Regions:
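Generic structural "secondary-structure junction" signal
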Residues: 18, 81, 87, 113-114
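Short secondary-structure boundary/hinge segments and terminal tails
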Residues: 11, 73-75, 114-116
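Short beta-strand->loop
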Residues: 1-11
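Short secondary-structure junctions
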Residues: 1, 104-105
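Short, structured secondary-structure boundary patches
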Residues: 5-6, 20, 85-88
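A bilobed periplasmic-binding-protein/Venus flytrap-type ligand-binding module shared by bacterial periplasmic
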Residues: 12-29
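Hinge/cleft segment of the Venus flytrap/periplasmic-binding protein
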Residues: 106-116
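Secondary-structure end/capping motifs
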Residues: 24-103
Length: 116
């Protein structure tokens, strides 16, 4: 049976992962990357036709209609123009991954910092 992971398991992947030991959060490079990421998310949310065209460029075996359905199902509901993550979805995902790995879970808001 073929299945898409997003049909069964939701992990918010919006954002940028930074190890503050190597790249301080307030560094100009990290801040520039955050701004670029937010611009990209805003474009995906505000210009769905552009996003669908881009997705189609690397999922080139899919028809335009299939790519549009993909966007509507896996992109539009989860990628917001402001880059914020739904912490309820994130909590469920973090707990599920921790359970699968047999490790203690951590607070989702510790992973998905909204202060940047």
């Amino acid at each position: 049976m073929l299945a898409w992971v997003g049909d069964h398991f939701q992990i918010p992947t919006v954002g940028i992962a930074v190890d503050p030991a190597h790249n301080p959060i307030d560094s100009p490079a990290v801040q520039a990357l955050v701004r670029a990421n937010r611009r990209a998310l805003k474009t995906m949310a505000d210009q769905p036709d552009l996003a669908i065209g881009y997705i189609a460029s690397f999922l080139n075996r899919m028809t335009h209609e299939e790519v549009q359905r993909y966007y509507e199902r896996y992109i539009r509901p989860y990628y917001t123009s402001d880059g914020r993550v739904d912490l309820n979805v994130a909590r469920q995902a973090v707990d599920a991954v921790a359970a699968e790995l047999g490790v203690a879970s951590v607070a989702a808001d510790a992973i998905y910092a909204s202060s940047l």
